[in-house]
Amino acid sequence: MDKITVEVIKSSTSYIAEEMGIILRNTAYSPNIKDRLDFSCAILSSNGELIAQAEHIPVHLGSMAIGVKNTVDYLKKESIEIEKDDVIIVNDPYIAGTHLNDITLLKPIFYNDEIIGYVANKAHHVDVGGYAPGSISSNVKELYHEGLIIPPSKLVINGKLNKELLNLITSNVRVPKSTIGDLKAQIASLNIGVERILKLIEKYGDREVTEAWNKSLDYSEEYLKSKIRDINCICEAVDYLEYKDKLININMKIEIKNGKIKVDFTGTHRQLDAPLNAVYGVTVASTSFALKAVIDPDLPMNHGIFRVLNIIAPEETIVNPKKPAPVSVGNVETSQRIVDVIFKALYHEFPDRVPAASNGSMNNVIIGGRGWAFYETIGGGFGGRNGKDGVDGVHANMTNTLNTPIEVIENEYPIMILEYSLREDSGGAGKYRGGLGIRRVYKMLSDCMLSIIADRIKISPWGVNNGYSGACGEHYVIKDGKKIPLSGKDTLYLSCGDIVEINTPGGGGYGSPYERDINLILEDVKDEKISIKSAYRDYKVKIIKKDDDFVVDMEETKKLRGL
């Protein structure tokens, strides 16, 4: 097969995954999916290997490569035959590869009575039952506390919705209308995916399409090998998660040698009776994302890269726990720390490619009451990079979602937003400043339960190359005028009128702040990104307010900087 045809089929397949995402977004019910875009779509081979994916959520996509293959293997093991118009549903993290809120749907692509591949999507449902509204809480001790566990089962049988299974699911969740609407949107997305793949086959032929898919895997394998062929290194690092009064270590050693990459998590903290555990699928997703980001962001992401990558994640650790350890937080927080520790290790080999640490948390806010549940993640600062400041107020690394529009929150939930702003002085000082964190303030308009799942409250996002650390996160509840600090992982009841203040971490700085352009510092002060005090203390630049403007006192600044 000629290379042009292979490329056309490969690109067409990727776009089909993108179109699946468009359909899912446009037909979804919940704000978390239709507004925040907390979902992912992919196309896989007949044995469950990842062929193509849309540019959606990294933690979903990397784990989909594990989860779909596990599901296909489960169906074979249990002698469950999947027919042409069936749709499989699964959310068991130890099969599907993330956490219970992420419900995966899978549909076979039949051609000439044979399965030639699968279309799949994964979407974060705002509630799947369990201990707390939103199904994510730091208080849980085992998986059963986190919600309804669905093994691979037929949600659609011969084209008809399995109402018995759907009734079972909706009887165990707090917002059944949302669950039904989002599941139907996922089904519609799969139907479009199958339809488009069959049209591709009609145009090029089934053998040609599957051959092009296989060649795309070969290409990714060879592409990655070509990028590391001349690299021979061993890099090590450790970073930490915060849980109560403990620091939970993630140890990691990377060896790049002879066109292969080995990532070894030996020495990482043992699994916890707390939800910080990350199932193997999350570890794979985080590892592959971090390596791609550093080695070559243009690396085509499919199963071919796993032929080059060997991940050693010891069992019964927080990066490969044993069921029924709880895992809801591992998906959203431990995933971020895995990326950080890999970046930290690779900085020594790739100093020009690795940024300072980003905010390092998805900053999860889950609020719910009788008959409703609200979930969002809040962005923070991106780390400063060689040649560029970190981006302010963005979702970094393992998440790729949008913020929830204030108008949507106030229309859909008994919540009022009092403030949504950037945190002055939260970005780490550096030649290239870290991005700023976010302040978001909520007022409760009814009694409810709040869960905060965040990190980098004690250990700040690190800077590199003499850059300073970004600011830690700070979270508060204001009750009866009293401002009460929260830890990064809290679940508590709130009363109508209570106020919740979330301050997300900033990104670390890159390079010495004394090398930062003075004019950029002046602009930062004018834009209220850094204060006059920070300019003086961290950058050795004296700025004074003159009338309604700010100016640099160059004489004093030269003294401060030794110029």
From Swiss-Prot:
InterPro entries: Hydantoinase_B, Oxoprolinase-like. It comes from the Archaea. One of its GO terms (molecular function) is hydrolase activity. Belongs to the HyuB family. This is Uncharacterized protein MJ0963. The lineage of its organism: Archaea, Methanobacteriati, Methanobacteriota, Methanomada group, Methanococci.
